[in-house]
């Protein structure tokens, strides 16, 4: 079987698009449930929807205009989901919010581009650290939360380090 770079890019973009949409559907339903139960105001849910779905729409437009083999789509995922992830990290009190990045990080391995994965890992780590500083300055953290931040940081480093195996 012969390697075809165009077919590889098409396959990677289609797979990541499917995973990204599924992840956003799950998060949208979860956030809707939390909003209905009074955990978030409706305005926060509207902002969530915008941060969640506008990057997907932009990605779909780019795929339609440039074709599924476009190398730009991976950057749309990284930037679009990165902004959405930052919104979640900064607006939720849950220490588990950092896991929302793990499915996307594992998706990026499909592109088999070590430098790209490392750059995304650095960006994700900056978001987690900035979120921890933000929550600390807002008085939201307890001393036990710092252990959680250490775990988050370690998970992100490990995920980024997996790029060395490419």
Q: Each predicted region: which residue ranges?
A:
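Short, Lys/Arg-rich, polar N-terminal cytosolic tail immediately upstream
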Residues: 1-9
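Hydrophobic transmembrane alpha-helices and their membrane-interface boundaries in multi-pass
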Residues: 15-93, 100-106, 120, 124-129
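Interfacial aromatic-anchored transmembrane helix boundaries in multi-pass membrane proteins
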Residues: 86-93, 128-154
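Transmembrane helix interruption/hinge and helix-loop junction motifs
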Residues: 90-95, 112-114
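Conserved small/polar residues in nucleotide/adenosyl-binding loops
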Residues: 158-164
